[in-house]
Amino acid sequence: MFLMNLLLLIIPILVAMAFLTLVERKMLGYMQLRKGPNIVGPYGLLQPFADAMKLFIKEPLKPLTSSISLFIIAPSLALTLAFTMWIPLPMPQPLINMNMGILFILATSSLAVYTILWSGWASNSKYALFGALRAVAQTISYEVTLAIILLSVLLLNGSFTLSSLITTQQFTWLLLPTWPLAMMWFISTLAETNRAPFDLTEGESELVSGFNVEYAAGPFALFFMAEYTNIIMMNALTTTIFMGALLNPLNPEMFTFSFTLKTLMLTATFLWIRASYPRFRYDQLMHLLWKNFLPLTLALCMWHISLPVIMACIPPLT
């Protein structure tokens, strides 16, 4: 039964991820006043399947100087971790209702750093290594703010369980009292998933393609799938934390509909940002985090900690 539930979670994620690649290409196309893919199938709807078939029937490259075992493990581990992060996410019922669901997601996303590092190092190419080192520095840096923002929001929630966020947000979204944190969280998730304008890891003009420069065919497709799965996951997490849908036990389908709609809107915003903004310089990226986001998130975290203490002497309004 558990295996069946697991498949019912993974297969829709794979389908969503496949069509996200198509939506991105279509959206960028229309924003650049062109059509995007429109040949394979009606309106180009079968394009993701054609891409997948092309990539998986090609012969994978194994560079002579690479460390083969790490070179092959890295992409498969990246996709496995991308799927693992969905386990505690309530939609409205999680696959496994963990007591520390948020910590599990943070820990798993931290492990994803290793896949990038391994792929860059095992490729034995200077471009791949530079791309991997950039990606690792960027991901580790932005995880600091993600963790502090989560702590601040969870002080309002009173629990590390993701399901309790639904109960907390029955009357109002947490986005309203914590909107500065939500804005910083959204920008940090952009950096965490290596999306434009923070896609420094694959700066074409300087690093060719970043940490996956030596990958082709199947292993490259696995990295690609992991990236897009992470994008949907991060937006689903943002929806759960800041824009919790109302759960009516008599009609749980409405929760899923609302949850999906908000996740789609956030994902469309990710793609819109990619179409609109140029890439940051690396020093600007680090300056934004360590000089701007970190002091602000720490100050707001202190405010959230001290607020209940300040308000403790005020009698409740009955």
Swiss-Prot record:
Pfam families: NADHdh
Residue ranges crossing the lipid bilayer per the database entry: 2-22, 68-88, 102-122, 146-166, 171-191, 217-237, 253-273, 294-314
Enzyme class: translocase
GO-annotated cellular components: mitochondrial inner membrane
Membrane protein topology class: Multi-pass membrane protein
Compartment annotation: Mitochondrion inner membrane
GO annotation, biological process: aerobic respiration
Database matches in InterPro entries: NADH_UbQ_OxRdtase_su1/FPO (IPR001694), NADH_UbQ_OxRdtase_su1_CS (IPR018086)
Function of the molecule: Core subunit of the mitochondrial membrane respiratory chain NADH dehydrogenase (Complex I) that is believed to belong to the minimal assembly required for catalysis. Complex I functions in the transfer of electrons from NADH to the respiratory chain. The immediate electron acceptor for the enzyme is believed to be ubiquinone.
HAMAP family xref list: NDH1_NuoH
Name assigned to this protein: NADH-ubiquinone oxidoreductase chain 1
Lineage of the organism: Eukaryota, Metazoa, Chordata, Craniata, Vertebrata
Name of encoding gene: MT-ND1
